[in-house]
Regions:
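Carbohydrate-binding surfaces of carbohydrate-active enzymes
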Residues: 13-189
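Short, well-structured alpha-helical segments in soluble
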Residues: 7-12
Length: 189
């Protein structure tokens, strides 16, 4: 729901190199954002790679009319997600397989953009990848133990602030686990 129970332990493991998750399920459509589920800057300071699973295709296939938006609007969604991963130093996986194939309406344009994303991604790897956020925001991966199963306070105080407000408050931000601050792992802000 709002915590990442046990993430701190996994980040400290020498046996884990990367994490994969889809982007948040809220605000997936046009006008939304591509917010990763994990506190990606914590992964970075621990030397782990975050792979952003771009699964718009799968969700649009659940509802032929497009669960989040018309299929024709998928390209701007893909562009938004590429911008998210390129500006935050993340990896990305594009979900397309024999079960979930790209719509015939946009298949040629989609393939053209995926090639362009690959070119831009390879170029971006040569750039300075130092985060340039102005604000650090902290999550406590153990806070879930103290939350209720009711949505009376957890949703407005945790989920809404993180998912609704952070990407719209006007300053670039990095998202960390609280333990990163307590252990002195953060850059200067």
């Amino acid at each position: 729901r709002s915590g990442h129970l046990g993430l701190w332990k996994a980040l400290r493991s020498p046996h884990v190199d990367f994490f994969v998750s889809p982007y948040t399920y809220a605000f997936r459509g046009v006008g939304g954002d591509g917010l990763p589920m994990q506190p990606t800057e914590s992964l970075r300071v621990h030397g782990k790679l975050y792979l952003f699973e771009e699964d718009t295709l799968m969700h649009n296939n659940f509802d032929p009319g497009g669960r989040m938006h018309p299929v024709e609007k998928s390209i701007p969604i893909y562009q938004r997600h590429f911008a998210q991963v390129a500006t935050h130093g993340l990896g990305i996986t594009w979900l397309e397989n024999n079960i979930y194939a790209e719509s015939p309406l946009i298949v040629d344009e989609s393939r053209r953009w995926h090639r362009r994303f690959q070119e831009l991604g390879e170029w971006a790897l040569r750039l300075d990848r130092t985060p340039a956020a102005e604000v650090a925001v902290f999550l406590d991966d153990e806070s879930f133990r103290y939350e209720s199963f009711r949505n009376n306070i957890d949703i407005p105080l945790i989920w809404h602030q993180r998912v609704l407000s952070l990407n719209r408050f006007g300053a670039p931000h990095d998202l960390y686990l609280l333990n990163d601050l307590l252990e002195g792992r953060l850059p200067e802000y």
